[in-house]
Each structure stands twice: as C-alpha cells, then as structure tokens.
Design a protein with these regions (language model features):
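Conserved core segment of the aminotransferase class I/II
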Residues: 161-252
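Structural preference for beta-strand elements that scaffold enzyme active sites
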Residues: 131, 167, 287, 323-325
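Short, solvent-exposed loop/turn segments at secondary-structure junctions
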Residues: 30-31, 56-58, 78, 105-108, ...
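Conserved core of the PLP fold type I
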Residues: 1-128, 133, 139-162, 167
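N-terminal "arm"/small-domain region of PLP-dependent enzymes with the aminotransferase-like
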Residues: 1, 8, 12, 130, ...
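Conserved glycine-rich beta-strand-loop-beta hairpin in the small C-terminal domain of fold type I
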Residues: 56, 227-230, 234, 247-266, ...
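Short hydrophobic/aromatic beta-strand micro-patches
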Residues: 187, 289-291, 327-329
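PLP-dependent enzyme catalytic core of the Aspartate aminotransferase-like
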Residues: 4, 8, 12, 16-18, ...
Length: 352
C-alpha cells in the first residue's frame, strides 16, 4: 500500500512516473542516504566518489566518512545558472564520480535550483553515467510559488525530468512533520531499478540495482521499516494526493516564522548570506543563513551561544561562506520571538 501511494504522491506533486516497485520505505531519509551512498559507491570499481553540491546536510558528509567513501564538493554560491554546468563537469570528467547529491529546497540556504539548472545536472549525469541523489526533504516548500495542488501545475522541480539516473529521497518527518517514527521513501527511477551491474552480481550474486538495494543494503541495515509507520505514511500520501491534506499549507507556518526572525536578525545588523535565487529573494522556510560583520562561522556561533542563541556553523555544511544556519522549527511560542529580539539587541550593542 505504501509503495502504491508513494508512486501516486510523486505523480501528484512532481508529475513524475515511478512504479510502486521502485518506491522503497526506509527508516527515515537518513537511512535512505546512508544506504544509497553505499550502493552507488559499489556499482563500478572505477567510480566511488560522491559529489556534494554544497551547502548541504552535515550528517550526509559524516555518512560518507563513516563508510570510507571518497567525496568531492563545491559551494554553489558562486556557480548558479550557466556557471553550474562547467563546474560539475570539471569533477565528472575525471571519470570517478558515482553520484551527485544535493537538496532542493536547499538545507541550509533554502535556495531552489531552477529547471535549467536541474536540466544541466540531469544531462551531465546521463553523459557521465552518474546517479543523482535528489534529497526532497522539503518538497513543495518554495513558498514563493503556488505549489502543493495535487495533479496541477506548477509542480515541484526535479532532476527526474531530465535523466533516468536518479534516486529521490522523500522524508515523512519533514513533509508531514511526522518526525518521531522515522519513515521515508527512496524512489528509484524505473530504468535505474532494472539496470544490471556486473560489480553487484560479482559481489552479491544479485545484479539488478533495485533488487540489490532492497535485499542486500537495506536488509543488512535494518531488516525493514516498522509497519505502523508505513501505514501512517501511506495514509498521509493518499490524503495529500486526494486533496484532503494540505501539507504545504501546514508547513507554511515555518515560512511565517522565518520571515519574522529574519527581520529581527536584519534589524540588529546581521545579513542573509545566501540571499538570492537568480536575482529573486530566497524563499522563506525551515532554514536560512545569516552572517555578521567579518566574523567567521566559528566566531559567530561561539558568540551567539553566549547570548542564548543556538545554531550550526555554515562550515559544517560544506559552505565556503562565513555564517550560521538558523532553524525556526522550534520557534513555536510568541515569547520566543520576544526573547530573540532582546538577545540580538544586546548582542548588537556589544559588537558595535
């Protein structure tokens, strides 16, 4: 049931056709990325590297280090639009990149890759036979656009329109704020699911990618995902595709919190680090990035902690810019906004 509803959900909100067979439940997107990194690194002995388009989710960088998988990365800050293709190709041309990883919308910057940029990524992935791991944890959460209407344009942008070499990670904890149960779906394209890899057959006696992913990698990692969480996610997928659950409307509360807190940071001398999408102001959402004066990421993080403001350093996300990632998910009481205002006011007074 979950596989069927996941397939329908992806059609409803991405306008992408993926057979139920390829929609595979995982114990959260964390397990999805962990196992797909390992899978991709074993498809071709000549291709083991993971290419991260940064900034990104820090734990994914930790995952490849834990697994002993080599990686490369670059900060997208200076490589938007027509600059993106040549930069990615400079890595792929070496012939050792197994997979390209990014999130869209982006964690932590909340920038959103455009159709043209995704077309570029997809075409290069096809040309160099690399797999794109597209993390859609924040699917349809570019709140500048009227996304989230099932089976109606505009749809969430996705590399799935431009290559057959893709795996989509869809997170129940983010899309539906269903965090406690750890449930997600790794959606593998039909072509990639059926593809035979000699290296997999030699190593596991299972050559088809989709079969190997389920019967080797996921089985060894956890033996499966809890049935109760699968039933819950299936019900939410069904309700969303039926138009009964407005998950985008529910999540727009995070955009409201981001707008309010951004104004507070800006009022006290901070700046938005990743502030533009092709000349347009970046969307509001779960996360955004701020910097202050000439402070490095570590300096700003350490100083803000002294004033009772917690965040993570942009350095941990692979960013080459200086600043911190702000998360608004726990800003759920009116008095917290007043506390932030007062703490940043004192911070600014002490850092003139």
């Amino acid at each position: 049931e979950l596989k069927a509803q996941a397939s329908r959900f992806l059609k409803a909100f991405l306008d992408v056709d993926i057979a139920p067979q390829g929609c595979i439940p995982t114990v959260g997107s964390m397990q999805g990325s962990f196992t797909t990194f390992l899978l991709c690194s074993q498809l071709d002995p000549a291709k083991r590297k993971i290419l991260f388009i940064d900034p990104g989710f820090p734990v994914q960088r930790s995952q490849v280090r834990i697994l002993g998988i080599p990686s490369e990365s670059f900060d997208i800050y200076d490589y938007r639009d027509e600059k993106l293709g040549p930069k990615i190709e400079s890595f792929l041309a070496a012939g050792d990149v197994a997979a390209i990883v990014y999130s869209n919308p982006n964690n932590p910057a909340w920038i959103c890759l455009t159709e043209d940029e995704l077309r570029t990524i997809g075409e290069l992935a096809t040309r160099y036979d690399a797999i794109v791991i597209e993390d859609l944890a924040y699917l349809c959460m570019d709140f500048r656009k009227p996304l989230g209407r099932p089976f109606e344009a505009p749809y969430q942008t996705s590399v799935a329109r431009y290559t057959k070499n893709y795996i989509l990670l869809v997170s129940g904890s983010k899309i539906f704020s269903y965090a406690g149960q750890r449930i997600a779906v790794a959606a593998i394209s039909d072509t990639l699911f059926r593809r035979e890899y000699p290296a997999l057959r030699r190593r596991y006696n299972i050559g088809r990618l989709g079969d190997a992913y389920v019967l080797v990698f996921l089985y060894a990692a956890s033996s499966g995902t809890s049935h109760s969480a699968q039933h819950a996610l299936a019900a939410m997928f069904r309700a969303a595709a039926d138009g009964e659950l407005d998950f985008v409307g529910e999540a727009s509360e995070y955009a409201r919190r981001a707008r309010l807190t951004k104004k507070t940071f800006l009022r006290h001398g901070f700046r938005i680090v990743y502030d533009k999408d092709r000349g347009e102001q970046v969307s509001d959402g779960f996360f955004y990035t701020v910097g202050y004066g000439a402070m490095t990421s570590a300096e700003l993080l350490s100083e803000l902690l002294l004033y009772g403001v917690c965040a993570i350093s942009l350095t941990s996300t692979g960013s080459r810019q200086h600043g911190i990632r702000v998360c608004v998910s726990q800003m759920n009481r009116p008095e917290q906004f007043e506390m932030l205002e007062e703490r940043l006011r004192v911070f600014a007074e002490n850092h003139k």
